[in-house]
A protein has these predicted regions:
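Short acidic-glycine-tyrosine-enriched beta hairpin
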Residues: 77-91
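A short, N-terminal "cap"/entry segment at the start of jelly-roll beta-barrel domains
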Residues: 1-39, 52
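Glycine- and acidic-residue-biased ligand/ion/polar-headgroup-sensing regions
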Residues: 58-70, 75
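Short strand-connecting beta-turns/loops that link adjacent beta-strands
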Residues: 36, 58, 102-103
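Conserved short histidine dyad/triad with adjacent acidic residue
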Residues: 41-56
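Ligand-binding loop in jelly-roll beta-barrel domains
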Residues: 91-103
Length: 103
């Protein structure tokens, strides 16, 4: 399978910082992988941070919340996020994600 990764390990010491990601507030810390078809990211949005609103023009996105709370605005509708939540943004739709809690 060459360079294709099958397992991603979360290591908070091995994350890159992306300031104002997609036009969002503060920054996110993340590790990203893209194979030309699928994009995978594992990371952290700090309290008061966000991922700016964007459209998924060529792919879909699934967000699984490991810890903390926040919300997404998906096609204009607010959806609350908490530990264990899964948010899906299909191709052609837009969303933003915000951490408005202390964690």
């Amino acid at each position: 399978m060459g360079d294709i990764k099958m397992i991603f390990e979360y290591d908070e010491n091995n994350l890159e910082k992306y300031k104002n990601f997609k036009g969002g507030e503060k920054y996110i810390e993340a590790k990203m992988y893209f194979d030309g078809l699928n994009r995978f990211m594992i990371g952290h949005v700090p309290s008061g941070g966000s991922v700016g609103e964007h459209v998924h023009e060529t792919n879909s996105e699934i967000i699984y919340v490991i810890s903390g709370n926040g919300y997404v605005i998906y096609d204009g509708q607010r959806e609350e996020l908490h530990k264990g939540s899964v948010h899906y943004c299909p191709k052609g739709h837009k969303h933003t994600m915000v951490n408005d809690h202390e964690e």
